[in-house]
Amino acid sequence: MVTHALRVGNTFGLAVFRAGAGYALRMAPRRIVSLVPSLTEALFAFGVGERVVGRTRYCTQPPRCVGGVEKVGGTKKVDVGRVLDLEPDLVVAVREENARESVEALRAAGVPIFLGAPETVADALEMLEKLAGIVEAPRAEAVIGPIERVYEGLRRARPVRRPRTFVPIWKGPYMGVGSDTYVHDVIEVSGGENVCGAHTRYPIVSPEEIEAFQPEVVLLPDEPYPFSAEDLAEFYALDIPAAHGDRIHLVDGKLLTWYGPRMAGSLRQLSALLRLP
């Protein structure tokens, strides 16, 4: 019997890792549908990829492994009927990425749901540990151990000064990341000071407000909004230290938003970008 409980909290009324009573699966799941791209990658890294029978069209990693896995729609628009046809004994979802309606429909159909709600790097680590336990992952330590070591190293490092950092996740209008988001904690753990940290969720900010923030580093991710080289000129035109010091960087959005095996490398890369000369 799998003894790792899925704790039922008040988010969606489903399984989240926060508070409340729990229930346990009777055995390790054999037919898993993942609705979260980064956790699909994690399941393969854990050594249980052969049990993944369904994925979203955005679950593209690892590319050599997911090609033969059935697609069940997108992260927000899941084909619930297709998921049920696959007869899963576990569906993996995350509050921030998946639509409440889809997850509730699957739960109502009696499908066990693993629903994570990570708002910090520590939350993400706990989520990975719980998922690894539930699926009885043979390679859990190989995946999670390096992340824990990098995370603890960065926590101990405590930079003398944290550069003011702006990370937009959208354009038209620009949207930053507030203090209750996973990206905020990634910035802070990596050594930066999120200039939108006084806000919650995803605040809309104008170019004038960005100038008022006076960010020393700007990171432009390629997801969810696909910032590209064409957007650099708009930020270099602003009167901000990041422009004067040539510290406006295009980055892979997965560095900021993906949980799983790439977290250790992501934190290392971000800490290097946020280290002032």
Task: Walk through the language-model features, giving the residues of each.
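Short terminal hydrophobic/aromatic SLiMs and anchors at protein ends
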Residues: 2-3, 10
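Short linear motifs in low-complexity or flexible loops
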Residues: 3-5, 15
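Compositionally biased, low-complexity segments enriched in small residues
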Residues: 6-7, 23
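N-terminal ligand-binding lobe of clamshell/alpha-beta domains
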Residues: 12-277
